[in-house]
Amino acid sequence: MTKTICQFSCNISAWKIVCNKTLSDSDWALGYTHWQKNSESFPDFVPKLEFLAPLKRRRLSDSARLIFEAAWNLVEEKTNLPVVYASANSEINRNFSLWHALLTEGDLSPTSFSLSVHNALIGQWSELRQVKAETTALVANKDNLEIALLEAYLLLREGEKQVLVVVAESPLALEYNAHPVMRQPFSYALALVVEAGEQYQLSLSNSAFEMEPVLDSALEWVKNQHLNCTQWQTPNSMGGVWTWQKN
């Protein structure tokens, strides 16, 4: 018997996605198979981050640069928003590089190690934006976006007016021949400003996901914005189904 596990609602007042590739609106609407097939042919994009001093820019990894480019102007002067960051991979390429250095050189850079942990990226954001509000870093495998929005909803229920949600992924570099591994077609950072409201209603049920596979729910969300979809489903990491309703 199908059972509702949880349900909640929220508004998304602003959002922006930044990738290391340049996609047109029509590219976004075509979906994951198209992105995967054409990932090598999309033009490269490198954020300039002109709002940061050169010394501060140099400290940021490629993943961090995408996050800053997506979120910086989105929050404008609201520098002290609580942040929920979600990623399955986070700084996975830095981690593999560190493992290689440890095996071949027997030593690690303390700075590189400190920047390899899961919450390092959002820690850099907090430092450079002087965020003193609550920050959360989580990983939920298949449904990072949904769980991040649920965490934001709980913060709103505690009295916050807005929450910055950031979902970011960078695929493992091809030079690391690891199996099994799911590689996204490109690196991306999706930033959303979340508020209380009924614009989006999400419901998690224990039914099996029987539709065409959704390999990244954040990218699926972006695709559905370009298609003006009002209802869709995404898989939950524990085997359930998220049903989205956009009002």
Regions from the PLM with identified roles:
Residues 68-71, 139-161:
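Active-site-proximal alpha-helical scaffold in enzymes
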Residues 78-80, 160-163:
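Short, high-confidence coil segments that cap the C-terminus of an alpha-helix
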Residues 1-137, 168-247:
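Conserved "HGTGT" condensation-loop signature of ketosynthase/thiolase-family condensing enzymes
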